């Protein structure tokens, strides 16, 4: 079992509830599951434009699937590496991370994220994972000032990019625009890190680490991703590495399933882009089990497709290993979960297939662009006269931020990023369409 310091909460609690024998991480899971931010995921589409019927996944169903895969990974690692069972002592912890991992993502997917990042370009930027950290630690009203007040280890596990944005930002790589309609996502990629407004919580999370561990954990280097101008962090905690693998598997496999059912990805595209990788893999299991899996995936027999999806998920989950960094002192940082090389390559091929034929599909990009315009329009309107247009409770937060000399624009980003796709679209119509909405008496 890990040190008890990782079970501490930022705001001490002394709640004595009748016959409540839950562990700290079971309480964390309950707080996330019952939060308004989690419920809103049911109205945020996982992939814009695939919602033509009731089959498609939302961010909520995606998060549930990530949770199921994440606990499956932990279970098989516990059997494979009994010496590491102390690190895998709570399934509730991993469920918490997987359920919460998308909570901070704004309406309209990447389009909404880029739009908010642009509108916040002079006020600390915006990025979905940073917003998740902020919701859990400050915004969700489980407590007055400490958000959900989750355990320190839970907060460590949600840190996909453990460094303040200001330490990662590289200036001079952005293109100012004269009109919102000219905004290109490739020119305004978000800095992947924690908002500087939340450095106090970030410092608290990392408090138990030695100086050497903290310096290394928060270090960054130039990204290997083409055309990404900012620095990228290099390390994640053990729990975060499991959550991220579960997210990647769900994205690559389950989003692919949606695309196949909708007819967005075809059998010929599979044969061209994926089948050769499986057929010529250096791993015998991939060659034997996955070489002809496309036949089942694109079958009109529903049960055959589901069997193929299950085979893919099982293959990736059981190919995950624990690696030893050998440098970090803290076990939660020293050990990480990762995929065997051939399976990592196979998963990346599936992710690229989804990106190429689904995410980059012009019809889907048009919807993302439309969402981008909605978010920028809303932000511009609220920023022009916050005390006139914001809801009363958000006005109060904005005024308090102004009075304390804090970043009041962050309050606008908090409000808009919490909207669902439908609510944001409806609000945009109320503000900008010519039709009078006679909702007053």
Curated annotation (Swiss-Prot):
It comes from the Bacteria. Residues 1-27 are annotated as: Disordered. One of its GO terms (molecular function) is dGTPase activity. Residues 7-27 have a biased composition (Basic and acidic residues). The keyword Hydrolase applies. Coiled coil: none annotated. Pfam families: HD, HD_assoc. Keywords: Hydrolase. Transmembrane segments: none annotated. SMART domains: HDc. This is Deoxyguanosinetriphosphate triphosphohydrolase-like protein.
């Amino acid at each position: 079992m890990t040190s008890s310091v990782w079970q501490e909460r930022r705001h001490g609690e002394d709640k004595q509830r009748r016959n409540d024998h839950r562990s700290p991480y079971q309480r964390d899971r309950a707080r996330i599951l019952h939060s308004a931010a989690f419920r809103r995921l049911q109205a945020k589409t996982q992939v814009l434009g695939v919602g033509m019927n009731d089959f498609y996944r939302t961010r909520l169903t995606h998060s549930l699937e990530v949770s199921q895969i994440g606990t499956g990974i932990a279970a098989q690692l516990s059997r494979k590496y009994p010496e590491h069972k102390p690190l895998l002592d709570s399934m509730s912890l991993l469920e918490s991370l997987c359920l919460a991992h998308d909570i901070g993502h704004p309406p309209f997917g990447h389009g909404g994220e880029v739009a908010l990042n642009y509108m916040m370009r002079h006020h600390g930027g915006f990025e979905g994972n940073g917003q998740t950290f902020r919701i859990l630690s400050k915004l969700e009203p489980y407590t007055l000032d400490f958000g959900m007040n989750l355990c320190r280890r839970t907060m460590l596990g949600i840190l996909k990019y453990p460094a303040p944005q200001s330490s990662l930002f590289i200036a001079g790589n952005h293109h100012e625009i004269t009109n919102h309609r000219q905004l290109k996502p490739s020119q305004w990629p978000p800095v992947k890190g924690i908002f500087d407004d939340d450095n106090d919580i970030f410092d608290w999370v990392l408090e138990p680490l030695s100086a050497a561990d903290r310096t290394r954990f928060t270090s960054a280097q130039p990204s290997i991703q083409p055309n990404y101008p900012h620095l990228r962090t290099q390390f994640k905690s053990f729990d975060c590495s499991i959550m991220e693998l579960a997210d990647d598997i769900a994205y690559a496999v389950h989003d692919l399933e949606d695309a196949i059912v909708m007819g967005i990805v075809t059998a010929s595209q599979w044969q061209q882009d994926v089948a050769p990788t499986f057929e010529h893999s250096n791993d015998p299991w991939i060659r034997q089990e996955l070489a002809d899996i496309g036949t089942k995936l694109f079958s009109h027999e529903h049960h055959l497709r589901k069997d193929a999806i299950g085979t893919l998920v099982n293959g990736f989950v059981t190919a995950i290993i624990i690696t030893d960094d050998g440098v970090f002192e803290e076990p939660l940082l020293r050990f990480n979960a990762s995929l065997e090389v051939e399976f990592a390559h196979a998963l990346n091929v599936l992710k690229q297939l989804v990106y190429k034929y689904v995410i980059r599909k012009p019809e889907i990009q048009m919807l993302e662009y439309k969402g981008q315009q909605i978010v920028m329009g809303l932000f511009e309107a609220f920023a022009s006269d916050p005390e006139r247009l914001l809801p009363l409770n958000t006005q109060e937060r904005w005024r308090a931020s102004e009075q304390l000399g804090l970043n009041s624009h962050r309050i606008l980003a908090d409000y808009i990023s919490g909207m669902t796709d439908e609510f944001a679209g409806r609000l945009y119509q109320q503000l900008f369409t010519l039709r009078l909405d006679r909702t007053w008496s």
